[in-house]
Amino acid sequence: MINTNKEELLIGLVSDTHVPTRTDKVPEVILKDFKDKNVDYVFHMGDFTSIDIYEQFIETFGKDKVFAVIGNMDAGSSELKDILPESLEFDLYGHKIFITHGTGGPSMIVRRLNKSHDLSKYDIIIFGHVHRPYNEVWRDGKLYLNPGTPTDKRFTDINSYGYLRISKDKVEPEIIHL
């Protein structure tokens, strides 16, 4: 699990890499940026579309540092279905975090997430699927965060990934546009 012995953590966020269906590889700039910033962990919100890409993240950052969920486009991979859960939850420095892929189109994604999951006990909801970066505290007081997609222009004209810097007193999300 996640070690919170440090004062704060820097978590790299990526989703919907869609390799090889949309592109031939994860953009090197993301892997380099995560390494250069010495991320503590990487969260991937699904749609690898290939076990090879999941394994690339494991090889690059280490099995104990990569946490991922299955996406709708991963369902065809029995290997990914066998190892990736539909959701993850963490308590980091007292902040309760829920991670899932998501379903449906971009409009009303927050409502759909709340209908398909009981999010009442979480402070931060991190999701993928809609390809659009999303960083918003909603009227329920929860942070909804989506790093977008680094490779696919469906539903968006911006490719992106992100970071979450978190400590007892701080929650700082950041979206990076490519």
Question: PLM features: residue spans?
Answer:
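Short acidic, glycine/proline-enriched helix-loop-strand junctions
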Residues: 37, 58-69, 140-142
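A short acidic, amphipathic alpha-helical/loop segment
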Residues: 53-57, 112-115
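Helix-adjacent hinge/juxtasegments
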Residues: 63-107
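Internal catalytic-core helix/loop-beta-alpha segment
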Residues: 94-130
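Active-site environment of divalent metal-dependent phosphoester hydrolases
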Residues: 18-22, 48-53, 73-79, 104-109, ...
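Active-site neighborhood of phospho(di)ester-bond hydrolases with catalytic His/Asp-centered motifs
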Residues: 13-15, 41-47, 66-72, 99-101, ...
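N-terminal active-site segment of His-dependent metallophosphoesterases
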Residues: 1-56, 77-83, 157-159
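Binuclear metal-dependent phosphoesterase catalytic core
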Residues: 2-8, 36, 89-93, 120-122, ...
